[in-house]
């Protein structure tokens, strides 16, 4: 069913803080428990460095990993090559490779005043997404608010992975462009990334189940 398919697609996200504190061993531990892993390190460097780093990370058996789309097409193409080379060398299934567009902590004023980008934030995100698609990536990390325009302009098969998810009543924290799990589904998100609404909740398991149920509620089973 559609519901069981979504449950099978769930990942444990390992971010910078956990990976830098515990190292590659944490990947092995979580994989040994049967979970799929989204390694969220947002690689952004010169193309050769990103390619070599991606090869190392792919060899860990990661299921999803990302780079910064602002690194440019050449960097993203090298990342794609690194994934393919590692999979061929170690006989691994190809992980999902995605590009970060604009962080959900970025708003229009910050884009203009601090990053010196005068374009509309939606146009910037779409441009980065198109570059990621050209480079062979499987999708992008973006706000749920941008999912529909990305699917419409690129492809419905091009994945949108959307952080900035909060349950109703939760503190937004440092996120600027936030939506609920239900709204993310309405806007066409393929995956949602949920952190503090679960980890900082009084009952994390209950909040986790609320997020899942909200996101699944618009799927016709």
Regions found by a protein language model. Give the residues of each.
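Short, small-residue-biased leader/transition segments that mark boundaries at the very start
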Residues: 2-7, 220
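Alpha-helix-loop-beta-strand connector modules within alpha/beta enzyme cores
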Residues: 25-38, 82-93, 97, 150-167, ...
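Hydrophobic faces of well-ordered beta-strands that scaffold small-molecule active sites
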Residues: 12-14, 37-41, 65-67, 97-101, ...
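Structural motif
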Residues: 33, 60, 135, 187-188
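Conserved anion-binding
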Residues: 49-53, 60-135, 146, 157, ...
